[in-house]
Amino acid sequence: MEIKKLTADEVSDFKRLIEIFKDVFENDVDIPPVDHLRRLLSNPDFMVFVALSGGNVAGGLTIYVLHRYYSVKPEAYIYDVGISPEFQRKGLGKALMAEVCRYCQANGFENAYVEAEHDDVEAVRFYRATAYNHEVHAVHFTY
């Protein structure tokens, strides 16, 4: 297994990860055009990490870098995390989260965080099984 941060030249791996997200999250979103995905991968405030098994994308996550006015250190908002069903419960997700946390620490981030809906029992159980520092219960409002 290998974990890597995608570059703008690795759009095909990003597309494969989006397919995994579609499967895992059971949504039928259209995959955006290649130019859009390449632009995202070129944006220093957006990152994609993938877990590879046998050279193929088995899962991954996306990160939005948040710059804050009260600290010179950014935060990493881990947005989507998905592992292909055939690779779940084999340590890939935990290894991915651990590698991302190491990356963030080595690159001067204040912290990294991820949200899970309270009723998403599997996601909450997964995150509680990782090496997190703090759990916050919050109410999320969408506009």
Predicted features along the sequence, with ranges:
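A short beta-loop-alpha structural element at the N-terminal edge
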Residues: 1-16
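Helix-loop element at the rim of GNAT/NAT acetyltransferase active sites that forms part
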Residues: 16-29, 69
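Active-site rim helix/loop that mediates acceptor-substrate recognition in acyltransferases
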Residues: 27-48
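Conserved beta-strand in the GNAT
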Residues: 50, 56-65, 77, 82
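A conserved beta-turn-beta hairpin within the catalytic core of GNAT-like acetyltransferases
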Residues: 67-78, 88, 134-136
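Conserved acetyl-CoA pyrophosphate-binding loop and the N-cap/start of the following alpha-helix
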Residues: 87, 91-99
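Conserved active-site alpha-helix within GNAT-family acetyltransferase domains
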Residues: 94, 118-137, 143
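Conserved GNAT acetyl-CoA-binding A-motif
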Residues: 97, 104-116
